[in-house]
Amino acid sequence: MPTDTKRKAHDQEPTADSSDYDSDGSEEPDFINVDFDFRAPEEIDFQALKRLLQQLFYTHNTKLDLSSLADHVVKTSTTQGVGTTIKIVDDEDQDPYAFVSAITLSSEKKEGSEAANSLSKYLLEVTSKPSSKSVHDVIKSAASSTSTNAPVIAVLHERMVNMPPQVAPPLYKMLLEEVQASLVSTSATRPSHYLFFSRVFSADAFSDDEAMDEDDDDDDDEPSGLAGARKRKAKLARREAKKAGAKKDAPKSRTISDGMALAGSSDEELGLFHPEDIAISKFASNSLTYRFPPPPDASDSFEAPLFGRIALVPADKMDALLQQIETDLSMPAPQ
């Protein structure tokens, strides 16, 4: 049985403050110290885990049994010691800001397999087109109830957008250690691949013409409430992209913390919510990116198109992947 509190991580998160300027007018970022508590998922986290899963699968969330998946995260922690949530120290009763867990894909119909069945069915559905056959075949052969092939373990991870990306390396490292320990203790077959699922967004949605039109709009015409906030946020993002040289001149490997978060993909530039996706894509043997259907209020809320991304990383590449993520997202040395 896992202990309640796993580890603590000390991090620094920048915050904007209008008073943070020196005498020559340049801005000096302010920092607040935040102690993160890496904890085992608990029953109290169930609803928050469902919300994070809903965020992860976006408009496809209705295709999955989110309750079974959230329940799996809690039970896997209790029975196998696998999985972690992140909370603020001394705020343990509040909702987690992030979670990570693992689930072995399976189509076997038995009690307790609802989460694995739901996720496997969804992944097989979205990879069913001929263009995604390589991804589909790996998942299908591993999830089949009659298969003798090595399994595929899906990594479930989501975090709040404003979480510093430096929380990712310890989360993934702990998860891999826990999964490997669980495999040894249960004498289970080692996986052939780890499957990573994430969201990305369309940077192409913010065209230069749209940016110019938005900048010329009268602010009094902006909608109020949440729709207005989203429109102002989109306008700010477009302005920042123009300052960086617009889309055609912007680097294609930036992350969301840099503004538009561009990553080259086919004819469309895609932005990353999780910067570690760059390393995951690098080590993936197979991958697929597909578009989510827009929500009903997408046109009113000026919401950019979102995509789902599946990446299959061979199990023997996981150690190297974790080292790369740690290198990419390491905290800068204190001044």
Curated annotation (Swiss-Prot):
Biased composition range(s): Acidic residues: 19-30, 210-223
One GO cellular component, as annotated: nucleus
Keyword Aminoacyl-tRNA synthetase applies: no
Top-level lineage group: Eukaryota
GO biological process: protein transport
Pfam family name, one: BCCIP
Biased composition (Basic and acidic residues): 1-13, 237-252
Principal subcellular localization: cytoplasm
Sequence segments annotated as region (Disordered): 1-32, 210-259
Keywords: Cytoplasm, Nucleus, Protein transport, Transport
Subcellular location: Cytoplasm; Nucleus
Physiological role: Involved in nuclear export, actin cytoskeleton organization and vesicular transport.
Protein family per UniProt: Belongs to the BCP1 family.
Name of the protein this chain belongs to: Protein BCP1
Biological source species: Mycosarcoma maydis
Gene that this polypeptide is encoded by: BCP1
